[in-house]
Amino acid sequence: MKKIILSLLLVATTSAFAQSSFKGTLVSTDQKPISAANIILITLPDSTLVKGAISDAKGVFELPNTAEHKKIIIKITHLEYEPKILTPTQSQLGTIELTPATNQLGEVVLTARRPIIEQKGTRISTNVAQSSLQNLPRAEMLINFLPGVSTSYTGGGFEVFGKGNPIFFINNRRVRNLDDVYHLSPKDIESIELETQPGAEHDNSVGAVIYIKLKKKQGDGLSGSIENEEYFRKNGLHNNSWANLNYRSGKTDLFLNIGAYNNFKNHFYRNNELQTFTTPHQWRVTTNEVSDNNDKSAEVKVGFSHDFSDKHAIGASVWGGITPYSGHAYTQQETATYRNNAIIAKGLNEYDQFNQNKDLNANAYYEGKLTDKLKLQTDIDYIGQRSNNQTDLIEHNLLTSSAQKVHKHQEASSNWWNLKATFLQQIGKGALNYGTELSNQYRKETYNDNALTTPDIKNTEVRSAGFASWAYPLGKISTKVGLRYEYADFGYYENQQKSEVKSRIYRHWLPNVSVAFPWDKTQFTLSYVRKIKRPAFYELSDYSAYSSPFLYDRGNPYVIPQLNDEWTALATYGPISASLMYGHIRNAIHNDYSLSAINPNVIEKTIRNYDHYNLLKGVLNAQMQIGKWMPKLTLTYYKPFAKDVLPTSEAAFSAELMNQIALNDKWLVLALFNYVSKGTEREYYMYEQRSGVHLFVARMLFNQSLTIYGGVMDAFNQLNNHSEFRNPYIMSRQSKNYENYCIKVGIDYNFNTTQNRYKGHGVNN
C-alpha cells in the first residue's frame, strides 16, 4: 500500500513539474543580480536540450517545463561564471549563487569575457548584454557607440562606415519608423550586428543594415515603459513624450505605443547670399531669416504578434501620425538686392506656414520554417500619406513702401503597397537566399500660387524585383555572391494627360560579391556592389515652384539614373576596425543653379546629371573597455576626385570621440566630442568648420528600472552648416544656425520588462 501511495505521489509530482515552469533568481557571490545567463532544460539520459531561458536585469528567469515526465537537469551557464547543474525537486528554485570563472596564473587573475566587438564576414557584431553599453539610458545613445557608426551631419540620422543612413531590423523584423528603435531599452538588447555589405535581398539604396537582437524573455502580463524628454533652448522649448505598453498571454502579444512631440517658439536662423554674374551686371541678394516653430505632433501604433510554434509566427501593426496637428511656423526675412554693389531693393517678407502631413502605415508578416532546411519570411506593407501645405507670404518693398501678397497651397496624396517574400535554403554547407519584391504606388499632387501657374500632377509607379544570393564557406574563407534584377514602370501625368517625356521604364541588373578571410589575428572582407539612384517623381517635373521673390525650384525631366560601382575593404583587429571604400559614379545626380527662363531676375534651383567621377572614403574605428571607461574614436576621410566635374572637390575630415564612464551600478557619465573640417559634401563646399561638445549624467534607481538623465547638447553652438555652391554664373552661400545648444533632461521608467513584442526570428537566423 505504501508503495502504491509513493508511486502516486511521484506521478503527481512529475505531472506538476510537466505542467509548470521553473523559476529562480541568479546572483553573484556579492549578491548582485546576474543578467544574460543561459538556463537550459536537459532530459536524461540522452542529454537532449528541451527548453532555454535567459535571466533578466534582476537575475530572474522562468524556464517552461516541457520535458513530458522525463528525468531532467537544469544547466546554468554564463561567460563570466562557472557552469552550474541543478536537479530540481520543485518549481521554485529560489536564489542561486554563481561563482566567477577565473584562471589563476600566479597572482594574475584572468576573468573570462567575450569580446565586445567581433567581425564575421561582412558583419560586425557588438555584444551589448556583456558590456557596459546596456547601462546607457537610451537606445539612440547606444547606436552611436556601435563600431563604425557616426552621426550624419548632412541628412540626419546615422552613417555606418560612411555609407549613409542604414535600415533597422529588430529580431529580423524590418522597422520603418526609427521611433521603434529609439524607444527600445538597452537593457533588453542582447547584441547588435552591422551588415556593412547588404546583399541582393535589399534595395540598392540601402547602404548598411543594423540587426538588433533582443534578449529572449518569458512571462505573461503587462509590461512597458514611460519616457519624457525636455529640451530647454536659449529661445524655445521642445518636448517629447512616449508610452509603450505590451500585454502578453501565452504565445500572443498585444502592444500599444503613443507619442507626442511639441515645439514652443523654437528659433532657427538662416543667412543667404546669392550672387549672379551676367553681362554687363553683377547681382547680389542677401537675406536674413528668423523662424519660430510652434508645431505639435502625435502618433499612435497598435499591433499584435503570435507564435503558433517555434516554427511559425504571424504579426501585424498599424501606425498613424499627424505632423503637426496644430501650430504654425512664422518666419521674418530681411532682403537686400544689389546691382554692381549699388542697392536697388530692400524688403521685409513675412511667412506664415502650416505644413501638415497625415501618415498611415500598416504591416503584416508571416515567417516560418517550412522544412529543416527551408525558411520563409513574407511581409506586406502599406504607406499612405496625405499632405496639406499652406504658406501666406507678405512681401514688403521698404524702398517704395509697397507690398505684395503671395499664397501658396500644395496638396498631395500617396498610396504605396509592397509585398516581399524571402526564402533561405540550406544546401550542403552553403545557403541560398532568394525571393521577390513587388510594389505599387499612386500619387496625386496639386500646387498653386498667385505668382506662377502649374498643372495638376499624377504619378504611378509599378516596381518588381527578383533576387538571389549564394553563401558558401571554403575552409576559413567565406564567399557570397548575389544578383538583383529591378524593373520599374513610372508614369507621369499632367492634367490627366500622360507625359511620354517624363514617364520612364527602368530595367537594371545589380550584382554584388564579397570574400571574407582571416589573416593571423585580423579578419578581412573584400566586396563589390553596383548601386543605382533613380530620379524621384518630383525631380522630373519641369514646372517652377515659388520659393522666394528671387528663387524658384524646378525639376528636370531629362535626368537619367545614376550608377555607382563600389569596392570596399573592411578589416577588424581586436577593438580596431577600418573600412576603405572606392566608388566610380556615372551620371551623378546633383543640384545646380541657373538663370530662370521665365524671369531673368530670378534664379532657378534644379537638378541635372554631372559627368563621371570617383570617390574615396576611409573610416577608422577604435573601441574598448578600460575598467569603468569605454572610449570610442571614429575618424572619417572623404575625398571626391571630381575636378572640372563638381563645383568643388576638396577633401573633408571628421572625428568623433565618445566616452562612457560607469562610476558604479547607479551613476553613468557620457562625454561626446565631434569635429568636421571644411571640405566637400556632395556638390557643396562647407566653408566653416563644425564642432560639438555634449555632456550627460545618468542616475539609475529602483534596480535600474528608473533612469533620470540630463546634460548639455552642443555646448558652444558650433554644429551649424555653412555651405557654398559655385558655377560660372552663380554663387550661393547659406549659413544655418540651428540653435543646437540646449539643456536636455529626461526620465525613463520601465516596468515588468519580461515581455518582448518583437518575437520574430527571421530567415537569417
Show the residue positions of the predicted features:
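Short acidic/polar hinge/loop motifs at secondary-structure boundaries
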Residues: 64, 173-199
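Short, acidic Ser/Thr/Gly-rich low-complexity loop/linker segments typical of extracellular
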Residues: 45-60
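Outer-membrane beta-barrel signature, preferentially recognizing the C-terminal barrel domain
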Residues: 459-461, 501-504, 532-586, 603-616, ...
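N-terminal periplasmic accessory domains that precede
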Residues: 91-98, 107, 139-142, 157-159, ...
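Face-selective signature of the C-terminal outer-membrane beta-barrel domain
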Residues: 297-325, 349-495, 518-523, 577-578, ...
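Extracytoplasmic beta-strand/coil segments of soluble accessory domains associated
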Residues: 140-173
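Short, acidic, small-residue-rich periplasmic hinge/interaction motif at the N-terminus
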Residues: 40-42, 75-81, 93-132, 163, ...
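Outer membrane beta-barrel strand-and-loop segments of large Gram-negative receptors
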Residues: 416-420, 463-467, 560, 566, ...
